[in-house]
Amino acid sequence: MRPLVCVLWMFLFALLSSHTESVAVMSVDLGSEWVKVAIVKPGVPMEIVLNKESRRKTPAAIALKENERLFGENALGMAVKNPKVTFRYFQDLLGKRLDNPQVQAFEARFPEYHLVKDERRETVLFKLSEDLTYSPEELLGMVLNYSRSLAEDFAEQPVKDVVITVPAFFNQAERRAVLQAAQLSGLKVLQLINDNTAVALNYGVFRRKDINATAQNVMFYDMGTRSTICTIVTYQTIKTKDSGTQPQLQIRGVGFDRTLGGLEIDLRLRDHLAKLFNEQKKSKKDVRENQRAMNKLLKEANRVKTILSANNDHMAQIEGLMDDIDFKAKVTRQELEDLCADLFNRVSAPVQQALASAEMKMEEIDQVILVGGATRVPKVQEFLLKVVGKEELSKNINADEAAAMGAVYQAAALSKAFKVKPFIVRDAAIFPIQVEFTREVEEENHSKSLKHNKRILFQRLAPYPQRKVITFNRYTDDFAFSINYGDLSYLGPEDLKVFGSLNLTTVKLNGVGESFQKRSDYESKGIKAHFNMDESGLLTLDRVEAVFETVADEKPELESTLTKLGNTISSLFGGGSSVSETKENVTDSVQEEDEVPTEPTKEEEQESADPADKQQDKENNKEKGTSATNEKEEGKKEEEKAEPQE
């Protein structure tokens, strides 16, 4: 009862409506194999929802019969009878094209599914018949809706507000696909929270008293069903303007392996069991060509793997595997480890990536905490101990429920119905994003050529939420710029293939020339593009505007004119609306960062050649206040400086 009392003490319920129908909030931890749901309602702080079988987690599976949808264990039962209509592990397909390596791997592992191209969105569809298809987003929406029904039954009231966990390595397309699925289910998404951040938040909430001004560095190693992610988190108290001294967690480093997880071990063992059955020659047929039998073997492989984590050997057995033929074979832990030797060799890579990205050494890490079901495999722990060099690995959090509990704490903090003690979260964007554009320059021989420019918008591991502004100083006519992912050289070749296109969107600005013609008597201060990366890690282009100022001899009231540009940015990335505004009691504003300057033009090189001139320019700029936020709206002070020196 102690943890419950602790949480009850932390939650101060306020602003409760007299009608409690819509007060409760929920979280959904979307795993590849399991879904965990948690709720907060008046009198019930941070509780895991029990499903209809009174279990604390539900298989992430859905079966579609003619007039019925089956979820969880019922769906898994249908997988043996009719695998073509039972869908699992489809989160790997979110936001991906048919030629993506992960989609191709999915087809190879689960040949019972017929995947086709969505001609409208160029993503993936499950084709059940000539007239019936489902997108992964639609299937995920059904799972989310079912999760909502479990939460409502448990809470005994309607639930709409939700925080959903996503893998930290999800890119913009994958995050928007999850958001679209939530919209299809009718849920109001308060935030998409990275699952590693949710785990870190849950850990910090229950150890609030242990956090002080001295930084504590904790490494979380999470090996789940489909992937592995290693996160370095720094905990310490900081002083805030609004609420005094509060605890904060900051994501310092992240390393991951998209395809290293428990499912890969299951698939190896499944294929080994299929080989053993064929060698017994009890049937003339190849069991690998029978999808129902292969689903039975996959289920048995998962069971045997779990038992071998605590035993040296075990008997795999299935009644009526194929053609009423029973299967029985002994499997040893050594055999399993030999089958997966190359997988275990990959255990250390996420740790090394996390340390490198955080620019830290293992000696600076105070403890290593295990998260995720696959970390229970003894060989995984053995390899992990070698790479971290610690005497032991900590297992002091609930590996299954930590993400769901951290996410529901965040949901309560963002809800207007509850007031919680602040816990500041400084998340980090794993992938850098940059703006690219071309402009015409004059060469020494007076000929003209196009010069390609790059401007870093968000660097790797840049904290968010955060706003930034880029100013284009030398355009006087319509132009376009591209928003792309930045330098991803730290990813391997296979990861880059999975990542897909590096282009997020191309923005075409219309009306620039017309604005300049109408205000030829005004001084141009450039064209400003305002970007926002919100609490969900989603990037949006808020607006683009041309900024003009009157000359000194004109009337003071005409001191500044902002001209909005008609352009194609009303929905920058498409496929889903932006996340609704949330309270700022758990996230904190991000301070400005320096950015890499663009390559100077010939004229600028000449201007900066004389040190005295350079110093004078610096002083002039200081007097003029040429920052990214030098405009009428004082409320944009948090926006970053990002002005290309064209």
UniProtKB/Swiss-Prot annotation:
GO cellular component: endoplasmic reticulum chaperone complex; endoplasmic reticulum lumen
Matching Gene3D superfamilies: 3.30.30.30, 3.30.420.40, Actin, Chain A, domain 4, Substrate Binding Domain Of DNAk, Chain A, domain 1
Keyword Chaperone: yes
First and last residue of the signal peptide: 1-22
Residue ranges crossing the lipid bilayer per the database entry: none
Example GO BP: endoplasmic reticulum unfolded protein response
GO MF terms held by the record: adenyl-nucleotide exchange factor activity; ATP binding; ATP-dependent protein folding chaperone
Pfam families: HSP70 (PF00012)
Keywords, sorted A to Z: ATP-binding, Chaperone, Endoplasmic reticulum, Nucleotide-binding, Signal
Chain intervals for the UniProt region annotation (Disordered): 572-646
KW Chaperone (keyword) present: yes
Subcellular location: Endoplasmic reticulum lumen
Basic and acidic residues bias locations: 611-646
Lineage: superkingdom: Eukaryota
Bias-annotated ranges (Acidic residues): 590-610
Function: Has a pivotal role in cytoprotective cellular mechanisms triggered by oxygen deprivation. May play a role as a molecular chaperone and participate in protein folding.
Family according to the record: Belongs to the heat shock protein 70 family.
This protein's name: Hypoxia up-regulated protein 1
Source organism: Xenopus laevis (African clawed frog)
Species lineage: Eukaryota, Metazoa, Chordata, Craniata, Vertebrata
